[in-house]
């Protein structure tokens, strides 16, 4: 870039800066901020993906695609049917790797924020975390009908936080789904089907 050229820089926290190149010094450019504006590229609702740990390296692809599609945060969850069992050391390394993938995917997709990849948690911890959200969806392969789910999705409003639980390849245990339904029986819009 030449002196006097304009560029837009994102800070990863939802802000864009329109800048002009003023000069170059050694190995850096000196920029002047002309305008600061909110990045409008994010979804109107914050989507939290509670993802059951899949086999092999499938989580890398899941993180990449979820971030590209607009997920606000990915929370890896150790469910009963998860084949992958991670000790603390392996889990830490995996989360670091997944976070790097999230950063790359966010840049590639032109996201205004860098979505976080949470620490690997238990299913019970994930349910506790989801209690703070406005809407929780748990797609379940043995559920009957989709009308209630469609209605809940249609009623999601801008600014609401939405948790989506996705099981591992084997899906959720029936008792895991029942446990979630017991926690989320309230007047707020929740779906346990």
Please name every model-derived segment.
Residues 9, 165-168:
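Thr-Gly-centered strand-to-loop micro-motif
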Residues 1-38:
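N-terminal positively charged helical leader segments and presequences
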Residues 184-193:
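Single conserved hydrophobic/aromatic residue that forms the stacking wall/gate
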Residues 138-159, 163-166:
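Active-site/ligand-binding-proximal alpha/beta "capping" segment
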Residues 34, 40-137:
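RNA substrate-binding interface of SAM-dependent RNA methyltransferases
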Residues 172-177:
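Short, glycine/polar-rich helix-capping loops at beta-to-alpha or helix-loop-helix junctions
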């Amino acid at each position: 870039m030449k002196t006097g050229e304009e560029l837009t820089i994102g800070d990863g926290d939802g802000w864009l800066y329109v800048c002009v190149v003023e000069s170059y010094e050694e190995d850096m450019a000196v920029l002047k901020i002309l305008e600061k504006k909110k990045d409008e590229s994010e979804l109107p609702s914050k989507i939290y993906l509670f993802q059951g740990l899949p086999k092999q390296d499938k989580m890398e692809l899941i993180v990449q695609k979820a971030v590209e599609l607009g997920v606000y945060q990915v929370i890896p969850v150790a469910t009963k049917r998860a084949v992958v069992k991670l000790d603390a050391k392996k889990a830490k390394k995996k989360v670091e790797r997944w976070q790097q993938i999230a950063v790359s995917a966010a840049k590639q997709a032109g996201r205004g924020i860098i979505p976080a990849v949470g620490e690997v948690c238990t299913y019970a911890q994930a349910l506790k975390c989801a209690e703070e959200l406005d809407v929780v969806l748990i797609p379940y392969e043995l559920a009957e009908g989709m009308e209630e789910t469609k209605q809940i999705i249609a009623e999601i409003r801008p600014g609401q936080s939405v948790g989506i639980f996705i099981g591992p390849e084997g899906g959720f245990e029936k008792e895991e789904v029942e446990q979630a339904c017991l926690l989320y029986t309230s007047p707020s819009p929740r779906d346990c089907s």
